[in-house]
Swiss-Prot record:
It comes from Agalychnis callidryas. It is found in: Secreted. Expressed by the skin glands. Residues 24-46 are annotated as: Disordered. Residues 30-40 have a biased composition (Acidic residues). GO terms for cellular component: extracellular region. This is Adenoregulin-related peptide. Residues 23-43, 79-81 form a propeptide. InterPro entries: Frog_antimicrobial_propeptide. Keywords: Amidation, Amphibian defense peptide, Antibiotic, Antimicrobial, Cleavage on pair of basic residues, Secreted, Signal. The modification Isoleucine amide is found at residue 78. GO terms for biological process: defense response to bacterium. The lineage of its organism: Eukaryota, Metazoa, Chordata, Craniata, Vertebrata.
Length: 81
């Protein structure tokens, strides 16, 4: 009977150690995945900020060109009178 108790305790102990190791590896994998997700979202944020800046620059250039064209039209109309 004592032999069975010792064997059972040994099996339980080894099972707990194995479970602990598995949980630790699982946590490490989750941390790695989270870090990869953070890097990807950071890259996306950087890409979107560049697109946003390019859009602002294009809008500014278009507005400037439209303003200049309108000024030329008004100047031409005033010059004709």
């Amino acid at each position: 009977m004592a032999f069975l108790k010792k064997s059972l305790l040994l099996v339980l102990f080894l099972g707990l150690v194995s479970l602990s190791i598995c949980e630790e590896e699982k946590r490490e994998n989750e941390d790695e995945e989270e870090q990869e997700d953070d890097e990807q979202s950071e890259m996306k944020r950087g890409m979107w900020s560049k697109i946003k800046e390019a859009g602002k620059a294009a809008a500014k250039a278009a507005a400037k060109a439209a303003g200049k064209a309108a000024l030329d039209v008004v100047s031409g109309a005033i010059g004709e009178q």
